Structure formats: C-alpha cells, structure tokens
C-alpha cells in the first residue's frame, strides 16, 4: 500500500511542476488517502501484535 502511495506521490510531484491542476490534484489526494489508510493499518496491526500468541 505504501508503494502505491509513493507512486502517486511521485506522479503528483512531477505534475506539480506544471501546477496543481487536474492530474496533480487527483494524484496528491490519492497518495494522501493511501498514506493515511496505510498508517492506520500499521498502528492497528502493531497494537494487535502486542497481545501475544495464542496458547498451543
């Protein structure tokens, strides 16, 4: 998921050279949404991983 966020961020940065219109604005929003979702999932799985392993 972070790979997609980085991809859209790079697209947004390249398109930003031409101004934040059209593709750049969309790519920026998609990159931001993917980053936030990935960060939330990271925190959730980090907290769930602290519960320990179930008994055998």
From Swiss-Prot:
Protein's UniProt keywords contain Chloroplast? no
Please give the InterPro entries that the UniProt record associates with this protein: DUF1328 (IPR009760)
Respond yes or no to whether keyword Cell membrane is given for this record.
Answer: yes
| TM stretches of this protein | 1-21, 29-49
- Gene Ontology cellular-component terms listed: plasma membrane
According to Swiss-Prot or TrEMBL, what is its membrane topology?
Answer: Multi-pass membrane protein
Q: Where in the cell is it found?
A: Cell membrane
Q: Which keywords does the record carry?
A: Cell membrane, Membrane, Transmembrane, Transmembrane helix
NCBIfam families annotated for this entry?
Answer: PRK13682.1-4 (NF010229)
Its family remark reads: Belongs to the UPF0391 family.
From the Swiss-Prot or TrEMBL record, give the protein name.
UPF0391 membrane protein Noc_0482
Record organism = Nitrosococcus oceani (strain ATCC 19707 / BCRC 17464 / JCM 30415 / NCIMB 11848 / C-107)
């Amino acid at each position: 998921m972070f790979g997609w966020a980085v991809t859209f961020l790079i697209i947004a940065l390249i398109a930003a050279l031409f101004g934040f219109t059209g593709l750049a604005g969309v790519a920026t929003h998609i990159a931001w949404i993917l980053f936030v979702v990935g960060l939330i999932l990271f925190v959730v799985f980090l907290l769930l991983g602290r519960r320990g392993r179930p008994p055998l």
